C-alpha cells in the first residue's frame, strides 16, 4: 500500500511540472471570455490576499490612466473591465518574494485609454477589477471606476455686483460649472483667497455661496468665484461690492445770540452731515442743516428820579428835608440805576442856626438814637418766641397722629388673627338698606387674578368700572393666587408659592368666621415664606413634563396644550444624558408687558435647564392665536433673561446670520429651532391696525344649584388649547361645567370693546340681575393677552326652586365687529356633573415622554439616505433647497445653509410639524416631485421592515 501511494504522488508531481497554462492564455489572446476557475496547486497554499487594489481614476484630456494590483500568494493576476477579461498583452507583470514568509508576490499593471472609456455604452461608468489565483482558489478586488474628467466653461450662476449699507448682510451666490470630479470652489477678494477661519465675518455655505455677516467699509472690493478640479480652473465674472454709508446729522449746535440787542430779532443753530459723513455714494442727510427762530430781547430800562418832595418842617437842629425816589421809571432788565442823592437837607432859620447842608450819603451823619436800638432788640426777642411756639404745636400734632395710626395697626392685626380674613369664595349677606343694592362703584369686568389685602375682596377693584350691574360680574375664583398681607409684611413682597392652588384643597362648607380655616391660611402663608426656593420647579403635572434623554433624542409633549419639545437624534453629545423638562407658565408675572399695539399670542413656555450644550437645534412647538395674514402682523419671539425682563430674540422676516433661532409659522402654531433652552413667548404687533387675533368663547355654569341664584360665566380666552385646558381645570375646582362647545371669535385691533349680553330669558320664571342691557370688557384688556381667565359673570334669579329649565341666548361680539351667539338650554336638576372630569381626564391627557427612535416618524436609516442625497449642492438646484421649498420651509434659507446638514435640520422641523398625524405622505410627495425616486424605494423598503 505504501509503494502504491508513493507512486501516485510521484505521478501527480510529474503532471504538475509538465503542465503549461499557455493554451488557456492563448484563448484569452484570441478573444476568449473565460479563464479556468482554478489551477492545479498544492492544497497547503492560502487564498490570495490583495496588498494593493485598483483605485478610481480620471482620464485627463487624452492621457491614459494606469491601474495597479498587487497580491500574494498568487500564481496569476488578471484585470477584468466591464465584465470582459483584458488581453494578456495589456498586462505588465512583476514578481517578487516576501523575505519574511517566502511567498511569491505578484503585481500587475494595465493602462486604460480615453477611447476605451468612450466606447462604453450604458448608464454605468467604466470599471475594472483584479482577479488573483492561487492553488486554493480566486480572490476579487474592489471595482475601480474610470471616468473622463472635464470642467465646463460656463458657471450655472455667477455672483452679481451689489451696493449695501454698512453693517448689513451680503449674499453672493455662485454655482460652479458642471464637472467630473465635482469642482472645488473658493472665493477671491481683490485676488486674495478668502479664509473664513481667519476672518469670521465671512461664511462659505454648503452650496458655495459667500455671505458677509456684517458689511464693513473694508469689505468694499471685487469678489470672484473660482471653480477648479484636476482638469481646469474657471473664474466667474467679478462682482463689485460697494459698502456705502448714509450720512447722519451731528447734534445741533447752540443757538446763536439774538440778532438785535433790543426788541425782535432772529437766532439760528446749525448741524452738519458728518455723523457719519456719506461715503461710497451713500445718501446725504435728509432735512435742514440750519434752523432759524424768532427771538425777542427785552430792552434795558435806565432808572430815573421822581420829582423832589416838599420840604419838611424845620427840625430842632435848624434843618428841613426833602426826598425823591428812583421810580420814574425804576431800572429794569439790566438798566442803569439812578445817580445822585436820595435825600437833601438845608438850614431853615435864615442863618440864625448855622448848620452845614447834609445829605443821606454824608459820612458825618448823626448815629441812631438809643431808642431805635431798644426797638430792634425787642422785635428779635418776640420773633424767637413765636418760632418756638410754632415748633411745639407741630410736635404735638405729629405725636397725636402717630398714636392714632399705631392703634389702627393693632386693631387691623388683631382682626386678621381672629377672623378678619375672608376667603375669596365667600359672599357677604346683602344689607337690608335698599340703597346698598345698587352700589355706586360697579364691578370690575376684567380682573383675572387678585391680590388679597386683609378683609377686602381681591376682585372688587375700583379701577376701570362700568356701571351696569348690581352684583359682581367676576365671581371670586378659589383657585386663583392669594397673597396675605398684614401690618408687619406689607411691602416685603413675600407671598404664596407660585402655582399653588390653595383654596382648591380646603374643606368645603367653611366660612369666614371659622377660626380653623383662618389658621389654615396663616399656616400656608408661613410655609410659603420659607419655601421660595421651590418656585422654579415644574410641579403641576397637567402643565409640565420631564424626561432623561441621550444622543438618540426624543420628544416631550404636554397633551391637550399644543406644546412640545423635539430633541433630534444627535442633539445631545454622545455618551451624555440630560434631564430635560417642559413647562407652561401659568402666572401673569411670567408674561411680558404689552406696549402699544403689542399682544401676547402664545403661552409662556419654559424648556430647561438652561446652559446645556446642544450639538444641533431642538424644536419647540407652541400654539398661537394670531390670524396669520401677510402684512398684518409684526411677529417677534421673546425670551426672559435671568433678571426677569424680556428681550427680543428675533423679528420674523428680519433674520440675519447672527439670529440664534428660526421660526416656522403655521396657521395655529409656531415651531422654533433653538440652540439654547430657556423661557420663550411668541408676541405680535399690529401693523397699520389691521391685525386680527382669535378668541375662544366658553360658557360655564354651576353643576349643582340649590339656591335661587344661578350664574353663567362667559370666558374670553386666546384661541389656544393651553388656555382652554387651564380654564377647564379651574372650573373643575369651582364645580362648574361647560354648557356648550367653545366658539371662535375674530377680534380686530380696532380699539372697540368686547360686548356681552343675554337675550330671550323666560321672564315668567327667571329674571336677570343685570341693570344694563349688556356688559363690556375694555379693548386693551382683551388685546394685550396677558390676563388669565378673563371672563364676565351673569347672575340670574329664578322665582322658585321648582324652575329647573333655563333657556337663553348669549351674544358676544366686538363693537362694530364680528360676534357669536350661543343658544343655551340646560336643566338644573340633570346637569352632568362629571362633564369636566371627562374632558380633563380624556385619553392621552397625561404628559408623555417619548425616547429614542419611537419619537420620530422617519426611520434613522431613511433619514441618513435622504441627508446623503440632498446635502451636497446640485447644479440643477435639486437638493435641500428644493426640499425646503416643497415643504414650505424656505422663508430664510441662509439659516439652514449655515448648518452641517441642512437636510437634517429641515427633517427635524418636518418631524415637529407632523406630531399629530405623522404619516410620510407629505415627505414622499415632495421627494417624488423632486425626482428622487430612489428615496421613495428606500422609504418603502425600510418602512416595511
Curated annotation (Swiss-Prot):
GO terms for cellular component: membrane raft; plasma membrane. A lipid is attached at residue 403 (S-palmitoyl cysteine). The record marks 412-413 as: Cleavage. The modification Phosphotyrosine is found at residue 581. Phosphorylated on cytoplasmic tyrosine residues. Proteolytically cleaved by caspases during apoptosis. The cleavage does not take place when the receptor is associated with netrin ligand. Its cleavage by caspases is required to induce apoptosis. Residues 689-838 are annotated as: UPA domain. Residues 153-242 form the Ig-like C2-type domain. Residues 399-945 are cytoplasmic. Residues 246-300, 302-354 form the TSP type-1 domain. Its main location: membrane. Interacts with the cytoplasmic part of DCC. Interacts with GNAI2 via its cytoplasmic part. Interacts (via death domain) with DAPK1 (via death domain). Interacts (via extracellular domain) with FLRT3 (via extracellular domain); the interaction is direct. Interacts (via extracellular domain) with FLRT2 and FLRT3 (via extracellular domain), but has higher affinity for FLRT3. Identified in a complex with FLRT3 and ADGRL3; does not interact with ADGRL3 by itself. Belongs to the unc-5 family. Receptor for netrin required for axon guidance. Mediates axon repulsion of neuronal growth cones in the developing nervous system upon ligand binding. Axon repulsion in growth cones may be caused by its association with DCC that may trigger signaling for repulsion. Functions as a netrin receptor that negatively regulates vascular branching during angiogenesis. Mediates retraction of tip cell filopodia on endothelial growth cones in response to netrin. It also acts as a dependence receptor required for apoptosis induction when not associated with netrin ligand. This is Netrin receptor UNC5B. It comes from Rattus norvegicus. The lineage of its organism: Eukaryota, Metazoa, Chordata, Craniata, Vertebrata. The gene is Unc5b.
Amino acid at each position: 500500500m505504501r509503494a502504491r501511494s508513493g507512486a501516485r504522488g510521484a505521478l501527480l508531481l510529474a503532471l504538475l511540472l509538465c503542465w503549461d497554462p499557455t493554451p488557456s492564455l492563448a484563448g484569452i489572446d484570441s478573444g476568449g471570455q473565460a479563464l479556468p476557475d482554478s489551477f492545479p496547486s498544492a492544497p497547503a497554499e492560502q487564498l490570495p490576499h490583495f496588498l494593493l487594489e485598483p483605485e478610481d481614476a480620471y482620464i485627463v484630456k487624452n492621457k491614459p490612466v494606469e491601474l495597479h494590483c498587487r497580491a500574494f500568494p498568487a500564481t496569476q493576476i488578471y484585470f477584468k473591465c466591464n465584465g470582459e477579461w483584458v488581453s494578456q498583452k495589456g498586462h505588465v507583470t512583476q514578481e517578487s518574494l516576501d523575505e519574511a514568509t517566502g511567498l511569491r508576490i505578484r503585481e500587475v499593471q494595465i493602462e486604460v485609454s480615453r477611447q476605451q472609456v468612450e466606447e462604453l455604452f450604458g448608464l454605468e461608468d467604466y470599471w475594472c477589477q483584479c482577479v488573483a489565483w492561487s492553488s486554493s482558489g480566486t480572490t476579487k478586488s474592489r471595482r475601480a471606476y474610470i471616468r473622463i474628467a472635464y470642467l465646463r466653461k460656463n458657471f450655472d450662476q455667477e455672483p452679481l455686483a451689489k451696493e449695501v449699507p454698512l453693517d448689513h448682510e451680503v449674499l453672493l451666490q455662485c454655482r460652479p460649472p458642471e464637472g467630473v470630479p465635482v469642482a472645488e470652489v473658493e472665493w477671491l477678494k481683490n485676488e486674495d483667497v478668502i479664509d473664513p477661519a481667519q476672518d469670521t465675518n465671512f461664511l462659505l455655505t454648503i452650496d458655495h455661496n459667500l455671505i458677509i455677516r456684517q458689511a464693513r467699509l473694508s469689505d468694499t472690493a471685487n469678489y470672484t468665484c473660482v471653480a477648479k478640479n484636476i482638469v481646469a480652473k474657471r473664474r466667474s465674472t467679478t462682482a463689485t461690492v460697494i459698502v456705502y454709508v448714509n450720512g447722519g446729522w451731528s447734534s445741533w449746535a447752540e443757538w446763536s445770540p439774538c440778532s438785535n440787542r433790543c426788541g425782535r430779532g432772529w437766532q439760528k443753530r446749525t448741524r452738519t452731515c458728518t455723523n457719519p459723513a456719506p461715503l461710497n455714494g451713500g445718501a446725504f442727510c435728509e432735512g435742514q442743516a440750519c434752523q432759524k427762530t424768532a427771538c425777542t430781547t427785552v430792552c434795558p430800562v435806565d432808572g430815573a428820579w421822581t420829582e423832589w418832595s416838599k420840604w419838611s418842617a424845620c427840625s430842632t437842629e435848624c434843618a428841613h428835608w426833602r426826598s425823591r425816589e428812583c421810580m420814574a421809571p425804576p431800572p429794569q432788565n439790566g438798566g442803569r440805576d439812578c445817580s445822585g442823592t436820595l435825600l437833601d437837607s438845608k438850614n431853615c432859620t435864615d442863618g440864625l442856626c448855622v448848620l452845614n447842608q447834609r445829605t443821606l450819603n454824608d459820612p458825618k451823619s448823626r448815629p441812631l438814637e438809643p431808642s431805635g436800638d431798644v426797638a430792634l432788640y425787642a422785635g428779635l426777642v418776640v420773633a424767637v418766641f413765636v418760632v418756638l411756639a410754632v415748633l411745639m404745636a407741630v410736635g404735638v400734632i405729629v405725636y397725636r397722629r402717630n398714636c392714632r395710626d399705631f392703634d389702627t395697626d393693632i386693631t387691623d392685626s388683631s382682626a386678621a388673627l381672629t377672623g378678619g380674613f375672608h376667603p375669596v369664595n365667600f359672599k357677604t349677606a346683602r344689607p337690608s338698606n335698599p340703597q346698598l343694592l345698587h352700589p355706586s362703584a360697579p364691578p370690575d369686568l376684567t380682573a383675572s387674578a387678585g391680590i388679597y389685602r386683609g378683609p377686602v375682596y381681591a376682585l372688587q377693584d375700583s379701577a376701570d368700572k362700568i356701571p351696569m350691574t348690581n352684583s359682581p360680574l367676576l365671581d371670586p375664583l378659589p383657585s386663583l393666587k392669594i397673597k396675605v398681607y398684614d401690618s408687619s409684611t406689607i411691602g416685603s413682597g413675600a407671598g404664596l408659592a407660585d402655582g399653588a392652588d390653595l383654596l382648591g384643597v380646603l374643606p368645603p362648607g367653611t366660612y369666614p368666621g371659622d377660626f380653623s380655616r383662618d389658621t389654615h391660611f396663616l399656616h400656608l402663608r408661613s410655609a410659603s415664606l420659607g419655601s421660595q426656593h421651590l418656585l422654579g420647579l415644574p410641579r403641576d403635572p397637567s402643565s409640565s413634563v420631564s424626561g432623561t434623554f441621550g444622543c438618540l433624542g426624543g420628544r416631550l409633549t404636554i397633551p391637550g396644550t399644543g406644546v412640545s419639545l423635539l430633541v433630534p437624534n444627535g442633539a445631545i453629545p454622545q455618551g451624555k444624558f440630560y434631564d430635560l423638562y417642559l413647562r407652561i407658565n401659568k402666572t401673569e408675572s411670567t408674561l411680558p408687558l404689552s406696549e402699544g399695539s403689542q399682544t401676547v399670542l402664545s403661552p409662556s413656555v419654559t424648556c430647561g435647564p438652561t446652559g446645556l450644550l446642544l450639538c444641533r437645534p431642538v424644536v419647540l412647538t407652541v400654539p398661537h392665536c394670531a390670524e396669520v395674514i401677510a402684512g398684518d402682523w409684526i411677529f417677534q419671539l421673546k425670551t426672559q433673561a435671568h433678571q426677569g425682563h424680556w428681550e427680543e430674540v428675533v423679528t420674523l422676516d428680519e433674520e440675519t446670520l447672527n439670529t440664534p433661532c428660526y421660526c416656522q409659522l403655521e396657521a395655529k402654531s409656531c415651531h422654533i429651532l433653538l440652540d439654547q433652552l430657556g423661557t420663550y413667548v411668541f408676541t405680535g404687533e399690529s401693523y397699520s391696525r389691521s391685525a386680527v387675533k382669535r378668541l375662544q368663547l366658553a360658557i360655564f355654569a354651576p353643576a349643582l344649584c340649590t339656591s335661587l341664584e344661578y350664574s353663567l360665566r362667559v370666558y374670553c380666552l386666546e384661541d389656544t388649547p393651553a388656555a382652554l385646558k387651564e380654564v377647564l381645570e379651574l372650573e373643575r375646582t369651582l364645580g362648574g361645567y361647560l354648557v356648550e362647545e367653545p366658539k371662535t371669535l375674530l377680534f380686530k385691533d380696532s380699539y372697540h370693546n368686547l360686548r356681552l349680553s343675554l337675550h330671550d330669558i323666560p321672564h315668567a320664571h327667571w329674571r336677570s340681575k343685570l341693570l344694563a342691557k349688556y356688559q363690556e370688557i375694555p379693548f386693551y384688556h382683551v388685546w394685550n393677552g396677558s390676563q388669565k381667565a378673563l371672563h364676565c359673570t351673569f347672575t340670574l334669579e329664578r322665582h322658585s326652586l321648582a324652575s329647573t329649565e333655563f333657556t337663553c341666548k348669549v351674544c358676544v361680539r366686538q363693537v362694530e365687529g364680528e360676534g357669536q351667539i350661543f343658544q343655551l338650554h340646560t336643566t338644573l336638576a340633570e346637569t352632568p356633573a362629571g362633564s369636566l372630569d371627562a374632558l380633563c381626564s380624556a385619553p392621552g391627557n397625561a404628559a408623555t415622554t417619548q425616547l429614542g427612535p419611537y419619537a420620530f416618524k422617519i426611520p434613522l436609516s431613511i433619514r441618513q439616505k435622504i441627508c446623503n442625497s440632498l446635502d451636497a449642492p446640485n447644479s440643477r438646484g435639486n437638493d435641500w433647497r428644493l426640499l425646503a421649498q416643497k415643504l414650505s420651509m424656505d422663508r430664510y434659507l441662509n439659516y439652514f445653509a449655515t448648518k452641517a446638514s441642512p437636510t437634517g435640520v429641515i427633517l427635524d422641523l418636518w418631524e415637529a410639524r407632523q406630531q399629530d398625524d405623522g404619516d410620510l405622505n407629505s415627505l414622499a410627495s415632495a421627494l417624488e416631485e423632486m425626482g428622487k425616486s430612489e428615496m421613495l424605494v428606500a422609504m418603502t423598503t425600510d418602512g416595511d421592515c
